From Swiss-Prot:
<dbReference type="GO" id="GO:0071007">
    <property type="term" value="C:U2-type catalytic step 2 spliceosome"/>
</dbReference>
<keyword id="KW-0747">Spliceosome</keyword>
<keyword id="KW-0175">Coiled coil</keyword>
<keyword id="KW-0539">Nucleus</keyword>
<comment type="subunit">
    <text>Identified in the spliceosome C complex.</text>
</comment>
<comment type="similarity">
    <text>Belongs to the SYF2 family.</text>
</comment>
<protein>
    <recommendedName>
        <fullName>Pre-mRNA-splicing factor syf2</fullName>
    </recommendedName>
</protein>
<dbReference type="InterPro" id="IPR013260">
    <property type="entry name" value="mRNA_splic_SYF2"/>
</dbReference>
<dbReference type="GO" id="GO:0005634">
    <property type="term" value="C:nucleus"/>
</dbReference>
<keyword id="KW-0507">mRNA processing</keyword>
<feature type="coiled-coil region">
    <location>
        <begin position="72"/>
        <end position="100"/>
    </location>
</feature>
<dbReference type="Pfam" id="PF08231">
    <property type="entry name" value="SYF2"/>
</dbReference>
<keyword id="KW-0508">mRNA splicing</keyword>
<comment type="function">
    <text>Involved in pre-mRNA splicing as component of the spliceosome.</text>
</comment>
<feature type="region of interest" description="Disordered">
    <location>
        <begin position="1"/>
        <end position="36"/>
    </location>
</feature>
<dbReference type="GO" id="GO:0000398">
    <property type="term" value="P:mRNA splicing, via spliceosome"/>
</dbReference>
């Protein structure tokens, strides 16, 4: 004999099965309508995305046209002006707070920026291109003096020997009385010989031929005569021969 609860469960299951059996399946037209609605929804989404992309492309084209009409160095000038505005703002803030601006600026510099600045400062004697002969001569002098390595042991010995006179003042008589050592003179002579050897190696001046005829008064005139001979020599060969023989009319 079944319990009342089991009977109720069987009745519920029977009712559910009968209800499922009674509900009619979805028709083919409803399925087609659902698919069509999904396609239309997707099409609308794609259409909205296309319109948005078109607007963004148009905005980018307008911005690119504006950038092309600006001066070539506009970006650099803009960045420079923005930096100057920030610097002025910081200066005003420091002045209002009673803080030294340079000190506050140093506190904001990172370790990487400080190292990069130090490396930049260590680049001595940079080649900035030719400006005048005096600057070129000064740069050469700095380069040559840098190549001569000092004798630090001799320097320390001389420093201990002279004492306070090693750092002369306006009242000192030590200036001009120093006599260089023989090793220092030898280093200077060696460096001068290297300079002469290097200068001779890179010299483009051609040696003169002692046996050749001299038909010039200076080097500039010699170059002009060679150029004239190259272009007109074949036309003036007979005239030169007559002049040399003394038979010219």
């Amino acid at each position: 004999m079944k319990s009342p609860s089991a009977a109720v469960t069987e009745d519920n299951e029977t009712a559910g099965v009968s209800s499922k059996a009674e509900s009619p399946p979805a028709s083919t037209e409803d399925l087609a309508a659902q698919k069509r609605e999904a396609r239309l929804r997707k099409f609308r989404e794609l259409h909205l995305k296309t319109n948005e992309a078109r607007k963004l492309n148009h905005q980018e084209v307008v911005e690119e046209d504006k950038r092309q009409k600006l001066p070539s160095n506009w970006e650099a000038r803009k960045a420079r002006l923005e930096w100057e505005l920030k610097e002025e703002e910081k200066k005003r803030e420091c002045a209002a707070n009673g803080v030294d601006y340079e000190r506050a600026k140093l506190l904001e510099i990172s370790a990487e920026d400080a190292e990069r600045w130090e490396r930049k400062k260590k680049r001595k004697n940079p080649d900035l291109g030719f400006s005048d002969y005096a600057a070129a001569q000064l740069r050469q002098y700095q380069r040559l003096t840098k190549q001569i390595k000092p004798d630090m042991e001799e320097y320390e010995m001389e420093k201990q020997k002279q004492g306070e006179m090693f750092y002369p003042t306006s009242e000192s008589l030590y200036h001009g009385t120093h006599i260089p050592s023989q090793s220092g003179i030898d280093r200077m002579v060696t460096d001068l010989e290297k300079q002469i050897e290097k200068r001779e190696k890179y010299s483009r001046r051609r040696a003169y031929n002692d046996d050749a005829d001299i038909d010039y008064i200076n080097e500039r005139n010699a170059k002009f005569n060679k150029k004239a001979e190259r272009f007109y020599g074949k036309y003036t060969a007979e005239i030169k021969q007559n002049l040399e023989r003394g038979t010219a009319v």
